[in-house]
């Protein structure tokens, strides 16, 4: 089937690792026809245009692979806008807007994760170091896949669209209320 691959940015470690794994799988499966590999940044307009252009050129897109899911909903909406069927297989990430769209439209999809809670690891290890504690050499952090079987566990309609299900913030003060309605006015530039 026709596979359209979306990349966000070149040179980002986790995205290059994902692309390397995908490329290997694509090369080992000649029945997969990779019709394009497109860098779109997080530009929704560009992602929509790419889908429209490839649908016009190839007629069908059977699967969409993404190295990051920031434009997943836009990509799916581009299929809908074109009157084309959704891809038979869709790869996105654990953003709430994508998980909700997946659930609402009963897609065949998956959401590999690179949990945003990993940012905490560097901060925690720095605090441990500064307090004279031993910092472990290796950190093993879970990276579960969101699948149809566990989608309900991660999709949370109370959270904002760009909220990552694997935020690692569940045990933080004021979660989830502070995440539902963030006060963006408290973040101001200090002269």
Kindly label every feature range from the protein language model:
Residues 21-22, 36, 40-101:
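Hydrophobic alpha-helical
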Residues 13-23:
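Short, surface-exposed alpha-helical segments at coil->helix boundaries
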Residues 1, 62, 108-109:
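Conserved acidic residues
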Residues 5-6, 37, 104-116:
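Short beta-strand elements at the ligand-binding edges of bilobed clamshell
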Residues 12-15, 40, 44, 65-68, ...:
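Solvent-exposed, acidic/flexible segments
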Residues 6, 119-191:
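Hinge/cleft segment of the Venus flytrap/periplasmic-binding protein
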């Amino acid at each position: 089937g026709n596979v359209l691959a979306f990349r966000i940015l070149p040179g980002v470690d986790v995205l290059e690792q994902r692309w390397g794994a995908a490329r290997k799988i694509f090369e080992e499966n000649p029945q997969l026809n990779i019709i394009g590999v497109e860098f779109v940044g997080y530009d929704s307009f560009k992602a929509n245009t790419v889908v429209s252009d490839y649908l016009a050129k190839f007629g069908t897109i059977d699967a969409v692979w993404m190295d990051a899911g920031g434009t997943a909903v836009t990509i799916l909406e581009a299929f809908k806008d074109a009157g084309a069927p959704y891809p038979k297989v869709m790869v996105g990430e654990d953003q709430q807007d994508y998980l909700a769209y997946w659930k609402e439209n009963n897609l065949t999809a998956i959401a590999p994760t690179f949990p945003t809670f990993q940012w905490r690891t560097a901060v925690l290890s720095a605090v441990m170091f500064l307090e004279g504690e031993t910092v472990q050499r290796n950190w093993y952090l879970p990276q579960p896949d969101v699948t149809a079987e566990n989608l309900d566990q991660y999709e949370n309609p109370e959270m904002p669209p760009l909220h990552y299900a694997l935020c690692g913030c569940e045990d933080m003060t004021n979660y989830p209320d502070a995440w539902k309605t963030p006060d963006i006015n408290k973040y101001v530039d200090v002269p």
